[in-house]
């Protein structure tokens, strides 16, 4: 008579718990979380925002079925020197950003920390330029300070 695959009985709880914990490692999401792989390879190193210097302005072509050039900037982060591409939101906002400006970037909010919508490979967006909110500059509420 073949044995049972799972222990059962009054004192089997510990064994069942250990078995469950062992098999959790087969789950990719659990493994990434436990080994800290998200923070390890994250340019922001787990922080919600980061400061950086604009290296260049770039246009990223939108994915199908859209045909557009999404305005982005290449940013070198101050904290670790890594270079990332950040999307510049709002119509005509790229005109308020020059090379060597200091910007603050945050995650763009795509699924599972990835890129959003039709912008391939872009995981961040610009929220501040030289310490002033990009939205405030765009609305005309504040002047962009010159450095």
Curated annotation (Swiss-Prot):
Protease recorded as keyword: no
SUPFAM superfamilies xref list: Nucleic acid-binding proteins
GO molecular-function terms, A-Z: rRNA binding; structural constituent of ribosome
Superkingdom classification of source: Archaea
Keywords: Ribonucleoprotein, Ribosomal protein, RNA-binding, rRNA-binding
InterPro entries registered for this protein in UniProt: NA-bd_OB-fold, Ribosomal_uS12, Ribosomal_uS12_arc, Ribosomal_uS12_euk/arc
Biological processes per GO annotation: translation
A Pfam family annotated for this UniProt entry: Ribosom_S12_S23
GO CC field: cytosolic small ribosomal subunit; ribosome
Subunit structure: Part of the 30S ribosomal subunit.
Entries under HAMAP family matching the protein: Ribosomal_uS12_A
Functional description taken from the UniProt entry: With S4 and S5 plays an important role in translational accuracy. Located at the interface of the 30S and 50S subunits.
Name of this chain's protein: Small ribosomal subunit protein uS12
Gene name of this polypeptide: rps12
């Amino acid at each position: 008579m073949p044995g049972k695959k799972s222990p059962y009985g009054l004192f089997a709880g510990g064994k069942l718990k250990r078995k469950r914990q062992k098999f959790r490692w087969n789950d990719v999401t659990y493994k990434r979380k436990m080994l800290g792989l998200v923070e390890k390879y994250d340019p922001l190193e787990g922080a919600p925002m980061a400061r950086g210097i604009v290296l260049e302005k770039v246009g990223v072509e939108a994915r199908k079925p859209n045909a557009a050039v999404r305005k982005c900037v290449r940013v070198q982060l101050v904290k670790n020197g890594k270079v990332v591409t950040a999307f510049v939101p709002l119509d005509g906002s790229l005109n308020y950003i020059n090379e060597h400006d200091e910007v603050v970037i945050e995650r763009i909010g795509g699924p599972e920390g990835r890129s959003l919508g039709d912008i391939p490979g872009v995981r961040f967006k610009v929220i501040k330029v030289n310490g002033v909110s990009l939205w405030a500059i765009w609305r005309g509420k504040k002047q962009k300070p010159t450095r």
